[in-house]
C-alpha cells in the first residue's frame, strides 16, 4: 500500500474522533438501578451547569466517578442529574455523593427530598460532598450536615478562593491508602470550616498552606501560617460515615492520580467498603477530561482594559 491510501485510511479512522462533541452527554446512562442487592449501590448526584467552561464540571466529574466506580469489585454506581426522577434508585444506597453548587442551592434542600436524605442518613448511608457542596446556610439544616459529614462551611468564619496548593496527607486513615503529596495549581478551595470534634469521629486527611491574603474572615486571620484541612473523614457515633474534599473546582484536577485515589477511597470508605491496600485503581487518559462537559458560554472579556491604538 503506498503512502496516499495510507493517509486516506488514517484520516477516515481519525475523523470520528476529531468530530466528537465534548458536550454530548447522551452516552452517560442515568438512573440505572442495581440488578443485584448484594452489590454496594453508590448514588452520584451531579449538579447543573455552573461557572465557566472547565470549572464546576459537575456532570462530567460525576461521569468520571461513575466510570471509575464501575471498575471496583462489588460496586454498582448510579448517576442522576440533581436528584433522581425515580427515587427508588436511592433505596438501599450505601453512599450518596453530591458534586454541585452549595450555598442553599443543593437539590436535596427541598423538604420532601430533605426528609428522604435524612432517612437514609439515619439508616447509616454514607455521605460525600465535594467542593462547594459543603457550603450550607447556618441553621438546623447546616447543623445536620455537620453531624452527617463532620464539617460544614459557613460564611461567618469560612474562606474560599483560588490559589496554587501543595497538599499532604496526615495520619494513616484507610482513605489515604496510596495517596501521596500532590500539587493542585490554581484550583478553588474552601477552608476554616465548622468541624466536628475529633473525639466524635472527625479525622483530618489532607492539609496544606493557604496564602495569608486568602484569610478573609476574622477567625481565619487568627490562624496565619496554620496548615488548613482540605479533606476529612467522619465516623458518625450513631453509625454511618462521611467524607469531603473542598477542591475539584477545576476539571483538570481529576488528572492528578493522588486526588483521584483520595476521592475514590473516600467514597468507598463512606459506603462501608474496604479500601484496597494501594488505594482505588482508576484508568485515566487526558482525553477523558474533554467528555460529557456542560454547555457554557465563554467568559466575557474583562472590562477596563485600554483599547489598542490604531497605527497611523
Language-model features: locations:
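Bacterial N-terminal signal peptides
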Residues: 6-16
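Extracellular ligand-binding/catalytic regions of CAZymes and related secreted enzymes
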Residues: 20-37, 61-67, 71, 212-214, ...
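Catalytic beta-strand/loop cores that center a nucleophilic Ser/Cys/Thr
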Residues: 22-29, 154-239
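Stable alpha-helical elements in mature extracytoplasmic
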Residues: 38, 61-65, 89, 113-117, ...
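Short, solvent-exposed loop/turn segments at secondary-structure junctions
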Residues: 49-50, 103, 134-135, 181, ...
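A glycine-rich, often tryptophan-bearing local segment used as a flexible ligand/cofactor-contacting loop or short
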Residues: 103-181
Amino acid at each position: 500500500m503506498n503512502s496516499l491510501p495510507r493517509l486516506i485510511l488514517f484520516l477516515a479512522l481519525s475523523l470520528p474522533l476529531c468530530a466528537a462533541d465534548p458536550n454530548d452527554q447522551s452516552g452517560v446512562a442515568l438512573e440505572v438501578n442495581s440488578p443485584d442487592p448484594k452489590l454496594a449501590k453508590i448514588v452520584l448526584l451531579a449538579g447543573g451547569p455552573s461557572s465557566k467552561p472547565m470549572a464546576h464540571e459537575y456532570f462530567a466529574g460525576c461521569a468520571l466517578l461513575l466510570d471509575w466506580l464501575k471498575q471496583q469489585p462489588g460496586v454498582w454506581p448510579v448517576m442522576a442529574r440533581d436528584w433522581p426522577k425515580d427515587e427508588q434508585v436511592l433505596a438501599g444506597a450505601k453512599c450518596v455523593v453530591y458534586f454541585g453548587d452549595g450555598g442553599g442551592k443543593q437539590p436535596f434542600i427541598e423538604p420532601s427530598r430533605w426528609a428522604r436524605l435524612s432517612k437514609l442518613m439515619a439508616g447509616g448511608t454514607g455521605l460525600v460532598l465535594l467542593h462547594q457542596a459543603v457550603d450550607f446556610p447556618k441553621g438546623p439544616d447546616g447543623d445536620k450536615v455537620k453531624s452527617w459529614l463532620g464539617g460544614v462551611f459557613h460564611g461567618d468564619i469560612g474562606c474560599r478562593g483560588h490559589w496554587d496548593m501543595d497538599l499532604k496527607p496526615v495520619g494513616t486513615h484507610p482513605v489515604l491508602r496510596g495517596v501521596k503529596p500532590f500539587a493542585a495549581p490554581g484550583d478553588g478551595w474552601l477552608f476554616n470550616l465548622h468541624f466536628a470534634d475529633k473525639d466524635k469521629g472527625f479525622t483530618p486527611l489532607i492539609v496544606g498552606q493557604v496564602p495569608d491574603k486568602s484569610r478573609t474572615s476574622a477567625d481565619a486571620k487568627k490562624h496565619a501560617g496554620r496548615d488548613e484541612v482540605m479533606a476529612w473523614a467522619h465516623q458518625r457515633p450513631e453509625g454511618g460515615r462521611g467524607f469531603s474534599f473542598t477542591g475539584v473546582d477545576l476539571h483538570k484536577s481529576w488528572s492528578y492520580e493522588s486526588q483521584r485515589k483520595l476521592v475514590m477511597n473516600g467514597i468507598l470508605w463512606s459506603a462501608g467498603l474496604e479500601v484496597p491496600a494501594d488505594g482505588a485503581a482508576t484508568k485515566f487518559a487526558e482525553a477523558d477530561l474533554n467528555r460529557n462537559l456542560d454547555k457554557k458560554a465563554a467568559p466575557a472579556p474583562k472590562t477596563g482594559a485600554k483599547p489598542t491604538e490604531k497605527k497611523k
